[in-house]
Amino acid sequence: MANPKLTLNDVLIRPIITEKSFSGEEYNKYTFEVHRDASKHLIKEAIEKIFNVKVEKINVINVKPKPKRRGIAVGRTRSWKKAVVTLVEGYRIKELEGQH
């Protein structure tokens, strides 16, 4: 269930800047880290308002924490949510184009 206190500016945390995520740009796919309580509808609304584009579909992945060690201390990374956003043909997010 979506958090009622979540605003559109709180939904998107950061774009994912990796080689794999940039390979999807030629298919109009952009990858973002999003708030864990954000729904697909809220993510779509935020992308369309912030970047002035039309969203075709959204795939959401809940990334599970990985075990990590530092000396004898054992811990885990945090869990987070990733959204792969597919834009309607002809739309681009210009702010993310030149970050290769």
From Swiss-Prot:
Which GO terms of the molecular function aspect are on file?
rRNA binding; structural constituent of ribosome
The lineage's top-level taxon is Bacteria
Family matches, as InterPro entries? Nucleotide-bd_a/b_plait_sf (IPR012677), Ribosomal_uL23-like (IPR013025), Ribosomal_uL23/eL15/eS24_sf (IPR012678)
Q: Coiled coil located at which positions? A: none
- Record's function text: One of the early assembly proteins it binds 23S rRNA. One of the proteins that surrounds the polypeptide exit tunnel on the outside of the ribosome. Forms the main docking site for trigger factor binding to the ribosome.
Family, according to the entry, reads as follows:
Belongs to the universal ribosomal protein uL23 family.
This chain's protein is named Large ribosomal subunit protein uL23
Task: Give the species this sequence originates from.
Answer: Kosmotoga olearia (strain ATCC BAA-1733 / DSM 21960 / TBF 19.5.1)
